[in-house]
């Protein structure tokens, strides 16, 4: 049995932000959300988040019924933060996994290894360590041949010989709670910062073993915007390597960004300057980009999207989007459609083999199959108070520069003459002409000049 405690009380002054550090976004999710997600496969019995600075904002940002919040009203160090758990874990006999809310790159497999080592060896505590190329500023961990911790020395207290040891304390711990609970009340703040350090408890609980994480990038903490950018680069490299090894082609990977919540199938091609975000799913054979943004959208097989923005929308197989199209607000586009340049779809549903080739706006509309929307057609969906829907039947065609004033329904096989402003429903198999008759006045320029 394991309880997880996540330290999320700090302000993060080096971020120079009013937003609590743990709520800053990394690849579409906050730092602390990434930490929480990493422990979910461990099936912890409880998930305790220790909050302090802007506590209510952090709670609001982490709305989940599975989380419990513990307040550290005054931030007096990591040891003091864990002391706040004493009344919440009274009588608990299992293990406590302690994580930092600003260390977002930890893999679940690393935490599983830490827990397994802890439980197999019946340790009082097990700590995560790593070997850094440049360990300056980190406490050094000294172990015997069996990885039993002998000593933890802060960087400022290291001798020249001790500084040659590059094994550092990552600040990730697993404790036998009974042992830790006995030590916590006796921690002292005998340091320049007058804080209570959890590392002081590590040396007092009993046998402590270290587990080394091979990829030191996993334990990198976020303290400023530069480190946040570095973490994003690491995350992107992981994600893009994963998809390329799974059969996805990335042309110029350095110019592409992909959230780790995106799902791609083999033989998808992503071109330069393309960004895939949120819960996007793209099926096999689709080609996205260059210069496109796809967010929270589902794209079928063999879809192409060029220089376009697609958010919160669904596109079926074989449809071509762009260049310079904008789909948003739960647009749903059928199979083998064409959405061309400078077309915007908002909360609109199009049937199969429907074309909106250029310079059109369809908002709050439904169109059937094999519809052709002429250049410059718009749905006037807003009357100044609320929005109304436009319904367009199968095989209907609108001429260039048509305005469909909602609420309005066009039946099947309707033809809308170019330049028409349609304000009333049109029955099936009809031609609608809604424009002023053309008038020609011969000799107009000469006569106007004489006057």
Swiss-Prot record:
Its EC number is 2.7.7.23, 2.3.1.157. It comes from Nostoc sp. (strain PCC 7120 / SAG 25.82 / UTEX 2576). Its cofactor is Mg(2+). This is Bifunctional protein GlmU. The active site is at residue 358. Keywords: Acyltransferase, Cell shape, Cell wall biogenesis/degradation, Cytoplasm, Magnesium, Metal-binding, Multifunctional enzyme, Nucleotidyltransferase, Peptidoglycan synthesis, Repeat, Transferase. Residues 247-451 are annotated as: N-acetyltransferase. GO terms for molecular function: glucosamine-1-phosphate N-acetyltransferase activity; magnesium ion binding; structural constituent of carboxysome shell; UDP-N-acetylglucosamine diphosphorylase activity. Pfam families: Hexapep (PF00132), NTP_transf_3 (PF12804). It catalyses: alpha-D-glucosamine 1-phosphate + acetyl-CoA = N-acetyl-alpha-D-glucosamine 1-phosphate + CoA + H(+); N-acetyl-alpha-D-glucosamine 1-phosphate + UTP + H(+) = UDP-N-acetyl-alpha-D-glucosamine + diphosphate.
């Amino acid at each position: 049995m394991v309880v997880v405690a996540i330290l999320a009380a700090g302000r993060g002054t080096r971020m120079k932000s009013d937003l609590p550090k743990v709520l800053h976004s990394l690849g579409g999710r906050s730092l602390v959300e990434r930490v929480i997600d990493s422990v979910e496969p461990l099936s912890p019995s409880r998930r305790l988040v220790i909050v302090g600075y802007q506590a209510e904002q952090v709670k609001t940002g982490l709305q989940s019924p599975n989380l419990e919040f513990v307040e550290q009203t005054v931030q007096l160090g990591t040891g003091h933060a864990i002391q706040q758990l004493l009344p919440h874990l009274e009588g608990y006999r299992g293990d406590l996994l302690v994580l930092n809310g600003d260390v977002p790159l930890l893999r679940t497999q690393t935490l599983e290894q830490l827990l397994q080592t802890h439980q197999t060896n019946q340790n009082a505590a097990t700590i995560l360590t790593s070997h850094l190329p440049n360990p300056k500023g980190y406490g050094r961990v000294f172990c015997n041949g069996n990885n039993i911790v002998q000593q933890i020395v802060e960087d400022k207290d290291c001798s020249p010989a001790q500084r040659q040891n590059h094994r550092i304390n990552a600040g990730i711990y697993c404790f036998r709670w009974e042992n830790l609970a006995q030590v916590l009340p006796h921690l002292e703040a005998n340091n320049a910062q007058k804080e209570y350090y959890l590392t002081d408890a590590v040396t007092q609980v009993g046998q402590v073993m270290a587990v080394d994480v091979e990829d030191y990038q996993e334990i990198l903490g976020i303290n400023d915007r530069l480190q946040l950018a570095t973490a994003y680069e690491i995350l992107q490299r992981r994600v893009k390597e994963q998809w390329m090894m799974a059969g996805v082609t990335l042309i110029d990977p350095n110019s592409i960004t992909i959230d780790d919540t995106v799902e791609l199938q083999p033989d998808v091609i992503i071109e330069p300057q393309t960004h895939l975000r949120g819960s996007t799913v793209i099926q096999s054979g689709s080609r996205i980009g260059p210069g496109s943004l796809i967010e929270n959208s589902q794209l079928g097989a063999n879809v192409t999207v060029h220089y376009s923005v697609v958010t919160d929308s669904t596109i079926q197989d074989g449809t071509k989007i762009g260049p310079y199209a904008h789909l948003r607000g739960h647009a749903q586009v059928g199979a083998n459609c064409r959405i061309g340049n400078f077309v915007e779809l908002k909360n609109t549903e199009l049937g199969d083999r429907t074309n909106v080739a250029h310079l059109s706006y369809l908002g709050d509309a439904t169109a059937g199959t094999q519809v052709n929307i002429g250049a410059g057609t718009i749905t006037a969906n807003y009357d100044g108070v609320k929005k109304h829907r436009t319904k367009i039947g199968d095989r209907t065609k609108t001429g260039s520069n048509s305005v469909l004033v909602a609420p309005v329904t066009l039946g099947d096989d309707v033809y809308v003459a170019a330049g028409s402003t349609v304000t009333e429903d049109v029955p099936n198999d009809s031609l609608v002409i809604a424009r002023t008759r053309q008038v020609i006045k011969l000799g107009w320029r000469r006569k106007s000049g004489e006057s």
